[in-house]
């Protein structure tokens, strides 16, 4: 049993159930997918999805996949810092000395702080479960209404960051929290910035989400 947390690419309601990526994993690997992704969700929403997973299944599952972050970029969430630092007094070889100590930033006001909150919480809530992150894929343009028009990824977002900065932060979190990451940004082969890549997206007003292919 594998839990899938994330956004619209994971959400059951976006594609037919048998054409989601987790449905293909079910077919190929004979897993039981436990799907909690919700369209529009960001890293800050993952704790709520995880709590619902626990309410529904307790510890009766084997792994957690987290596929989220593209909406954080679109929402212009600042990248932020991983740690704060302060000088503390600590015992080192029987001598009290002053050293600089770093503490993870734990709040949802920045991207890195939000990742810290999520991974810290999941490792406490499910200490014996395998946790795997997946980076967002490349982003083409999308228009879902007059007030929801999303430019291509070659534009900076509202806080002056490119999508790459969010991808890099997820990969940094992999090392900081000892959580494997599947770099779909590099490995998926999907590049919806090109019209020739239309075979992989719905097309029209949506070059953001992958299709069943």
Where are these regions (language model features)?
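Soluble non-cytosolic domains of exported or imported proteins
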Residues: 16-19, 101-113, 157-164, 208-213
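Solvent-exposed loop/turn segments at secondary-structure junctions
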Residues: 8-12, 38-43, 69-75, 137-141, ...
């Amino acid at each position: 049993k594998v839990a899938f947390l994330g956004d619209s690419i994971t959400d059951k309601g976006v594609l037919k159930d048998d054409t989601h990526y987790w449905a293909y994993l079910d077919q190929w690997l004979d897993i039981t997918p436990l799907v909690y992704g919700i369209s529009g969700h960001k890293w800050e929403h993952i704790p709520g999805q995880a709590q619902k997973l626990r309410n529904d299944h307790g510890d009766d599952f084997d792994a957690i996949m987290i596929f989220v972050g593209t909406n954080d970029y679109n929402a212009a969430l600042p990248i932020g810092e991983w740690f704060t630092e302060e000088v503390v007094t600590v015992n080192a070889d029987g001598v009290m000395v002053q050293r600089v100590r770093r503490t993870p930033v734990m709040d949802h006001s920045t991207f890195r702080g939000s990742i810290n909150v999520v991974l810290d919480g999941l490792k406490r809530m499910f200490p014996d479960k395998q946790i795997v992150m997946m980076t967002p894929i490349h982003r083409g343009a999308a228009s879902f209404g007059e007030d929801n028009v999303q430019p291509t990824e070659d534009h900076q977002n509202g806080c002056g960051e490119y999508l790459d900065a969010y991808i890099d932060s997820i990969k940094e979190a992999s090392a900081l929290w000892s959580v494997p990451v599947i770099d779909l940004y590099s490995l998926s082969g999907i590049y919806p910035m090109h019209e020739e890549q239309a075979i992989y997206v719905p097309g029209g007003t949506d070059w953001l989400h992958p299709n069943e292919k």
